[in-house]
């Protein structure tokens, strides 16, 4: 049996009491959905039930309401993939007064932003991570921040993960999620995803 200090070192003492691999999987799944819109093939996987085990897992962790709301947005509808692509653009890609811009620098300012950007640069250098040139993503895009977090979960003590989460994500995600919920979209898939993302991360890194 692992001692308390060993559990902390391995990152197992997160508030959700789930494994490193489970945490990484959930964050990787969220990251992929925030990076680009769903393809028709990916949408088909959801509608065939290929993600039902993930949804059941999230419900078991206590995120039943958020998960059910997300599932409801995936019910078949005419031209669904096109609607989802349009919703992705409306939610994340328009001007900041219309969309939920997925960049840390759109929400943080001054010293708080400087501290966060320095931390991001530090870990990007440490892990030799580069930005996605194809997607033209700056280093403060939420998907880049999640890529760093996923690496930290696998390799760093929990307090290091928590420091990054609090300084580079949790201090602006609530406003990001609020704006995502206020966008005018047909399916609300991305708003519900953002709600689940914030709920999961808040619980995962609860003090």
Swiss-Prot record:
Subcellular localization, as worded in the UniProt entry: Cytoplasm
Top-level taxon of origin: Bacteria
InterPro entries per UniProt: Chaperone_TorD (IPR023069), DMSO/NO3_reduct_chaperone (IPR020945), HscB_C_sf (IPR036386), TorD-like_sf (IPR036411), TorD/DmsD_chaperones (IPR050289)
SUPFAM superfamilies registered for this protein in UniProt: TorD-like (SSF89155)
Any single Gene Ontology cellular-component annotation: cytoplasm
One BP term from GO: protein complex oligomerization
Keywords, sorted A to Z: Chaperone, Cytoplasm
Chief subcellular location: cytoplasm
Alphabetical list of Gene3D superfamilies matching this protein: 1.20.120.1820, HscB, C-terminal domain (1.20.1280.20)
Keyword Iron: no
Pfam families per record: Nitrate_red_del (PF02613)
Entry similarity comment: Belongs to the TorD/DmsD family. TorD subfamily.
NCBIfam families on file: PRK04976.1
Record function comment: Involved in the biogenesis of TorA. Acts on TorA before the insertion of the molybdenum cofactor and, as a result, probably favors a conformation of the apoenzyme that is competent for acquiring the cofactor.
Name of the protein described by the UniProt record: Chaperone protein TorD
Annotated organism of origin: Aggregatibacter aphrophilus (strain NJ8700) (Haemophilus aphrophilus)
